[in-house]
Amino acid sequence: MNTMNFSVQFKVRGDDFGGHFINGISMADSESFWKCKLVSADDDKNVYESADGYKIIAYHVKKGDVFECYTVFENNTDSVVTLDMISSFAITDLDFDTLHRATSFWSAEGKMLSQKLTDLNMERSWSGHGIRIEKFGQVGSMPVRKWFPFVAIENSEKNEFIGVQLYCPSSWQIELFRYKEPLTLLGGLADFDYGHWCKEIKPNESFTTPKAVVAVGDSLLKVCDMLVKAQQPDISPVDEDLPVIFNEYCTSWGNPTIENLEKTAKKLQGSGVKYLVMDSGWYKEEDKNWWETIGDWNVSKKLFPNGLKEVNDMIKSYGLVPGIWFEMENVAPLSQI
């Protein structure tokens, strides 16, 4: 496809919700959006002004193979404005027939789910009146829970694909909806209805959404490859050969003693495994469970009275590289900090 029609969707508290039976399902297509007028557009952005005194700048900056999208909302009024929804990206006038999503949970593999829009009841209504919508996302601090913050749509006749990834480490949502024929794809922070998100913006202040990246290609694999490369992953040279890592958690279940680790090291010697990683429990305090003291990261004197050097030297003696497990973002109830 040669061009994409980038747009924006937002909802200011106090304005009417959208019509066509969308209320309660989505905050898109609201009065806030319809009170806006496109005042300028160029290759990088669309600028909208509202009759109520807001200015919205929807960026879609081309960077390499992708478009980097985000939205800036400026409150140019004399009153505090509460945003209940605002998109990081929105693309309109789409003619596609298949939706691709990636599903997963904690401690699970990602799986691609591909569905025809007809299987999702996304055909227009007989009168064209009722909006059809497929909305998904997750609420909480786990960016991937049930769904990846990713979507791709496909026109199977033309072999056209659009892929999107949200850079949103919090509650997020993605929506595909149609009113009559054209489809609209949008996403960003979870709205007030879905994720109880809102943002108060004082007079002469602004709010910038998290970013999204958008890729266009002739296969699902290509657009996914573009989205990954857009992250500019910094791959360490030690990972270039995809070394095999053995994590010992399922052998000691949070009790990684020297004796347990040596039994494992003996089994792994000469197997082609490069790393032996000691998992949870190496820091646990006496008479406490390993999950109750996460956060202090003090070496257990009971498990390792001579410190970690002794166990590290033992692991190395079997031709393995020692590793250690942390969850630096976690603090448990019985930790000292």
Where are the model-predicted features located?
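Polysaccharide-binding surfaces and accessory modules of carbohydrate-active proteins
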Residues: 2-179, 195
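Short coil/turn motifs at secondary-structure junctions
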Residues: 76-78, 216-217, 329-331
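Primarily single-stranded nucleic-acid-binding OB-fold modules
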Residues: 168, 182-183, 252
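Short, structured beta-strand/loop micro-motifs enriched in basic residues and often containing a Trp
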Residues: 184-196
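Short Pro-Gly-centered flexible turn/kink motifs
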Residues: 199-217
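Terminal connector regions
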Residues: 215-243, 250
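Aromatic-lined carbohydrate-binding/catalytic grooves of carbohydrate-active enzymes
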Residues: 239-337
